[in-house]
Regions:
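Patatin-like phospholipase
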Residues: 1-73, 83-324
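Gly/Ala-rich beta-loop-alpha elbow adjacent to hydrolase catalytic centers
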Residues: 74, 78
Length: 324
């Protein structure tokens, strides 16, 4: 790793990469780092755009860096990808989008307007993550690296964090909640005394939340290129599904459009003197180019390309040679 230079797709403070390198060299493993730093991995959401982040997490794991983080934060698809890093399933995170999720069983626009959601979380949680890419949610209970899952309270659209849950059932419910969008991906999920929906509605990239939680270093994985974020006008006309959500709950449709929500945190991501950073070291990795993947893309070729681009972006940041 080179602390003096950042590759395309990497933006911010190379000290984050330097800390990763020092911890890997020390070899102490997750939860046993001897320095005084607190290194958070923050993974953005975005539906099928999560393929970019899946490739990034696979690259981090392949480089021996998965155990270097003190905590992982994620919203929606980012929470699922973050889970893969915590549990050592980086390869699955890279392949699940093109192998399993780019399908009509998971996303089928023909279900729009029926009683069945266009996006089937049942298929994801009860088939894909059981049969194809098995995930033991109970392993999160004893993980030395805590997972923080963002959810949105349905009643007031406020962001909340679910972490330190007692068992696998609770974790599975949290994962359903962080991806649930009424009319699109299923009804709100009841946890405790509240109903919860997709975490990216209120906080698609919880960098500020990780900083407020005490992180001294943050590596944020983006699922849009910088150009895609900057090019999204704040007054862009909302798609039909988002306007339908606004009729269900005023403001829900606008908040569910992750491009506009990401745009609101660009100043935090790009301004080293931003008051919310409080001297912390922050590095973002965004796809170095676009594969043309959107939130509901089901073209396996494009989705596989997004995973490959994510892997290449991390390899470039780490100074590793491009894969043949």
């Amino acid at each position: 790793m080179r602390s003096h230079s950042l590759s395309p797709g990497a933006h911010g403070d190379a000290e984050v990469l330097a800390l990763l390198e020092r911890r890997r060299t020390a070899g102490r493993g997750a939860g046993a780092h001897a320095d005084d730093h607190r290194l958070a991995l923050v993974v953005g959401g975005g539906g099928m755009r999560g393929a970019y982040a899946g490739g990034m997490v696979h690259a981090l794991e392949a480089a021996g860096l998965a155990g270097c983080f003190d905590e992982v934060w994620g919203s929606s698809a980012g929470a699922f990808v973050g889970t893969a890093l915590v549990l050592g399933h980086g390869a699955d995170a890279s392949r699940i989008f093109c192998d399993d999720m780019a399908s009509r069983e998971f996303i089928d626009p023909r279900r729009c307007g029926t009683r069945r959601p266009m996006v089937s979380l049942d298929h994801l949680l009860d088939h894909i993550l059981v049969e194809s890419k098995p995930t033991d949610w109970s392993s999160l209970v004893t993980s030395p690296v805590p997972l923080h899952v963002l959810v949105t309270r349905a009643s007031d659209l406020s962001a909340h964090v679910l972490t330190g849950l007692p068992d696998g059932h609770a974790w599975k419910s949290a994962m359903r909640a962080t991806a649930a969008i009424p009319l699109l991906a299923g009804p709100p999920v009841r946890i405790g005394d509240d109903d919860w929906i997709d975490g990216s509605v209120s906080d698609p990239l919880p960098v500020a939340r990780a900083l407020r939680g005490g992180a001294t270093h943050v590596l944020a994985l983006m699922t849009r290129t910088v150009d895609e974020l900057v090019a999204t006008p704040a007054d862009a006309r909302a798609p039909l599904w988002a306007r339908s959500l606004d009729r269900l709950a005023p403001g829900l449709g606008r908040m569910a459009q992750d491009a506009s929500r990401h745009g609101e945190c660009l100043s935090l991501l790009t301004d080293a003197a931003h008051p919310d950073r409080a001297g912390a070291h922050l590095l973002t990795l965004a796809p170095h180019t676009s594969a043309g993947v959107r939130g509901l893309t089901t073209d396996p070729g494009r989705v596989a390309a997004a995973s490959r681009i994510g892997h290449e972006t991390v390899d470039g940041a780490l100074g590793l040679p491009a894969a043949a």
